[in-house]
Amino acid sequence: MSEPNVRRHLDVDLHPTVCNLCGGEVEYIENYKVYGQSYGSGWMYRCKKCDARVGTHKPHPTEALGILSDSYMQKAKKMCHEAIDELWKGQRNEKKARTAVYADLAERLGLDFESCHIGYFDLELLRSAYRAIMDMREERGLTRKPEGVCSIKRNED
């Protein structure tokens, strides 16, 4: 029997060489080669086989922002961020509010706080996170958004 206060830790490779989705080779490239212009740090990791990708941190451009994501995961991450950001942005102390919101989400998902980054979530965890965020919004008097992420399915799902 597991201890109730033990939280799951997500082991994320922030310098990927193998794709977490298809096992293909990952390259570290300047992102203008994909997007036509440079964004953020100017760098990204991209799978040569399935084209999954992830951006990198601006101050640490070799460090990935999370796991490689296909178009389904990219859409789900965007929807989760849009929904959760409304819970803390514009608050008097945004940093404290953001920390509290993500601590709440981590608890609901059974994750340790350090693992609670939307960029670290696979599609299954993104679906769970979206449901939890909708509950959090409702509890705070904000409207629920459509079940968007929960309905995102890959062809093989």
Residue ranges, per PLM feature:
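Long C-terminal interaction/binding lobes of large macromolecular proteins
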Residues: 131-157
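Extended interfacial segments that mediate partner engagement and assembly in macromolecular machines
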Residues: 60-95, 99
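Short, surface-exposed acidic
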Residues: 96-121
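Short, charged/polar micro-motifs that form catalytic or ligand-binding hotspots
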Residues: 5, 9, 40, 66, ...
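N-terminal cysteine/histidine-rich coordination modules
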Residues: 1-61
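Chromatin/DNA-recognition segments of nuclear transcriptional regulators
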Residues: 115-135
